[in-house]
Amino acid sequence: MTRSVWKGPFVDAYVLKKAEKTRESGRNEVIKIWSRRSTILPQFVGLTFGVYNGRKHIPVNVTEDMIGQKFGEYSPTRTYYGHAADKKAKRK
């Protein structure tokens, strides 16, 4: 079920504060965040966020195409190594 329109997009307050502080300083540094659940807003375009995936911060450069999606969508938490090969089939 999607979020109700009257509530508006959810963004953790500390993410907004960090983004605003970085915009004011003018430096283009990675903003480390742990909030994968926060929605990407138009004022985040052009900034780089380090989204935590449980092990490390994955750098995410925000573009206009990402607006309205969540930060967690761009920082995968699981590593896929492929399906295990059948040992009998390998020997033949």
From Swiss-Prot:
GO BP term, example: ribosomal small subunit assembly
Cellular component, GO, one term: small ribosomal subunit
Signal peptide: none
PROSITE patterns with a match to the protein in the record: RIBOSOMAL_S19
Superkingdom in the source lineage: Bacteria
Sorted UniProt keywords: Ribonucleoprotein, Ribosomal protein, RNA-binding, rRNA-binding
Record flagged with keyword Transcription: no
Pfam family, one: Ribosomal_S19
InterPro entries: Ribosomal_uS19 (IPR002222), Ribosomal_uS19_bac-type (IPR005732), Ribosomal_uS19_CS (IPR020934), Ribosomal_uS19_SF (IPR023575)
GO terms of molecular function: rRNA binding; structural constituent of ribosome
Residue pairs linked by disulfide bridges in the UniProt entry: none
Gene3D superfamilies assigned to the protein according to its UniProt record, in alphabetical order: 30s Ribosomal Protein S19, Chain A
Record flagged with keyword Ribonucleoprotein: yes
PANTHER family named among the record's database cross-references: RIBOSOMAL PROTEIN S19P FAMILY MEMBER, SMALL RIBOSOMAL SUBUNIT PROTEIN US19M
NCBIfam families: rpsS_bact
Task of the protein: Protein S19 forms a complex with S13 that binds strongly to the 16S ribosomal RNA.
Protein family per UniProt: Belongs to the universal ribosomal protein uS19 family.
Protein name per its UniProtKB record: Small ribosomal subunit protein uS19
